[in-house]
């Protein structure tokens, strides 16, 4: 059984090796694979918007540089007086390059269409 040293006792080389291992096998492997294979991911954000795009870079805080992003959300249109039952309207916009701060990320999914096509 290998002894696990606390992070404070690791050399910079050991820290880098451990971080790379975590990025390749842990939850962040979804982002690692997206960067390596240039595949799309679907990101749910705290502002209740969804981002579908390609990850160019990321860090351990889930800060991301994204390209070719489609931002999607729903809005309730304003109603005049006396009108009822407003249907939500789906909206979207294209963003060619963006930086996404990690604290706004809730969930990251591999593109289900690309995953299904690969099977």
Curated annotation (Swiss-Prot):
GO CC term, one of those recorded: precatalytic spliceosome
Region (Disordered): 1-23
Protein's cellular compartments: Nucleus; Cytoplasm, Cytosol
Biased composition, class Basic and acidic residues, residue ranges: 1-18
Sm domain residues: 28-114
Main location: nucleus
GO annotation terms (biological process): alternative mRNA splicing, via spliceosome; mitotic cell cycle; mRNA splicing, via spliceosome; spliceosomal snRNP assembly
Residue stretches in coiled coil: none
PANTHER family referenced in this protein's UniProt entry, alphabetically: SMALL NUCLEAR RIBONUCLEOPROTEIN SM D2
Function: Plays a role in pre-mRNA splicing as a core component of the spliceosomal U1, U2, U4 and U5 small nuclear ribonucleoproteins (snRNPs), the building blocks of the spliceosome.
Family recorded in the similarity comment: Belongs to the snRNP core protein family.
Protein name: Probable small nuclear ribonucleoprotein Sm D2
Organism: Drosophila melanogaster
Gene field: SmD2
């Amino acid at each position: 059984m290998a002894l696990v040293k606390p992070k404070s006792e690791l050399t910079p080389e050991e820290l880098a090796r451990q971080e790379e291992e975590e990025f390749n096998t842990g939850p962040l492997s979804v982002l690692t694979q997206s960067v390596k294979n240039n595949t799309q991911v679907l990101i749910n954000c705290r502002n209740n918007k969804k981002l579908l795009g390609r990850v160019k870079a990321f860090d351990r805080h889930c800060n991301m540089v994204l390209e070719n992003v489609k931002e999607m959300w729903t809005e309730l249109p304003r109603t005049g007086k006396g009108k009822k039952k407003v249907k939500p309207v789906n909206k979207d916009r294209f963003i060619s390059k963006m930086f996404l701060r990690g604290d706004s990320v809730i969930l990251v999914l591999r593109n289900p269409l690309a995953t299904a096509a690969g099977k």
